[in-house]
A protein has these predicted regions:
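Acidic/His-rich structured neighborhood in mature extracellular/periplasmic domains
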Residues: 88-95, 99-210, 224
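N-terminal export signals and maturation junctions of secreted/periplasmic proteins
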Residues: 24-78, 103-136, 228-235
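Bacterial N-terminal signal peptides that target proteins for export
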Residues: 1-9
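Alpha-helical segment that forms one wall of the substrate-binding/catalytic cleft
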Residues: 148, 156-163, 176-180, 187-263, ...
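C-terminal segment of classical bacterial N-terminal signal peptides
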Residues: 14-23
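Solvent-exposed, acidic/flexible segments
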Residues: 63-74, 83-88, 106, 142-145, ...
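Catalytic and substrate-binding regions of cell-wall glycan-acting enzymes that process beta-1,4-linked
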Residues: 107-108, 113-131, 264-322
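Short, well-structured alpha-helical segments
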Residues: 78, 88-95, 270, 274
Length: 322
């Protein structure tokens, strides 16, 4: 009798293990683009490019030229990528996308260092109508976020509270724009601006600061010290770890939440670097695939946007750099 029970228990364990491995198997997302032709480029990007009297191809060649000609920059990208356990082509892809579609690259890396120093001379602060972000997040609506100790979940929670309570509303006599928290509180120059070689927003830097502290040993950033935040995202030596951390997080969250490995597809990591919201996008795709699996359908793969599409098109050139 005991032997029979043992056999049954063993069989059940083997069956459970097989089911568990199947349920949690991670699928490698194929390399390359899912879309045959490039998805549409936003009108704002096209307008900026026309105003600068240039073309996307010219802008691509400019940032690619910077990467190709600056061996020190390539070395820094390779080094930081090793630290964060990602392929350097992910960092290069994010740089290519940002400087092709969002801004125009400077010809030399030294220009970014000069710009970083100039920011230290400006008395910057993160506030809205005289209320600092530090005071703003002490409001009772944000109390639920205090349980989070890591910077990513803390600031992500605060973003959600902003969207659900303040965005587009009038609270206590103060009207708040129907815009992102990042654009309202974290852009002292003009809304929607990102900065530096990696074109990071201050809010993303604040979200990633704990990971960067853990992996690179850089000091943690504080929203009450805006100048240091801007110095970090403007200085190439400091911003590269934040780029790598952001890309690593996208890879990690898709593996953990959606059971998808996007580490071999730099077009997808570039897309997420461009759009943000990797956590929410991974959850949405996981829900879609759970339903598809229940219906006996194949998995839906994540798709690149216009920005990531270019990266995958140019991936052989980018890989050759390293």
């Amino acid at each position: 009798m005991k032997r029979t029970l043992c056999l049954i228990a063993t069989s059940c364990f083997v069956l459970f293990s097989a089911v568990s491995q199947s349920a949690f198997a991670v699928t490698l997302v194929p390399v390359g683009n899912r879309n045959v032709s490039q998805p549409g480029v936003p009108a704002a990007s096209a307008k900026r490019t026309r105003e600068m009297n240039t073309t996307y191809e010219a802008k691509y060649q400019k940032i690619y030229g910077l990467l190709k000609s600056d061996s020190k920059l390539r070395s820094k990208i390779a080094s930081v990528s090793r630290t964060y356990g990602i392929d350097p082509v992910h960092v290069a892809g994010a740089l290519i996308g940002e400087h092709t579609y969002n801004v125009d690259a400077y010809d030399r890396l030294q220009t970014y260092y000069v710009k970083a120093v100039s920011y230290l001379k400006q008395g910057l602060s993160f506030d809205y109508k005289g209320e600092s972000i530090g005071d703003f997040v002490k409001r009772p609506q944000f109390a639920e976020c205090n349980k989070f100790k890591d910077s990513l979940r803390l600031w992500s929670c605060r973003e959600n509270v902003w969207d659900n309570n303040f965005r587009g509303n009038t609270i206590g006599g103060t009207s708040y724009p129907n815009n992102r928290l990042s654009a309202v509180f974290f852009q002292p120059f003009y809304a929607g601006q990102s900065f530096g070689l990696g074109q990071l927003s201050p809010l993303v830097a604040l979200q990633m600061t704990d990971m960067v502290n853990r992996y690179s040993g850089l000091p943690k950033l504080d929203a009450d010290h805006a100048t240091e935040v801007y110095k970090t995202i403007m200085d190439p030596d400091l911003t590269l770890p934040y780029m790598a951390a952001t890309l690593k997080h996208s890879i990690d969250v898709y593996r953990r939440v959606a059971d998808l490995d996007i580490s071999k597809n730099p077009g997808l990591t570039a897309t997420l670097y461009n759009t943000g919201g990797a956590d929410a996008r991974a959850r949405a795709l996981a829900n879609i695939n759970a339903q598809r699996s229940a219906n006996g359908e194949s998995l839906q793969m994540p798709e690149e946007n216009y920005y990531g599409w270019l990266v995958n098109e140019k991936v052989d050139q980018l890989k050759a750099l390293f």
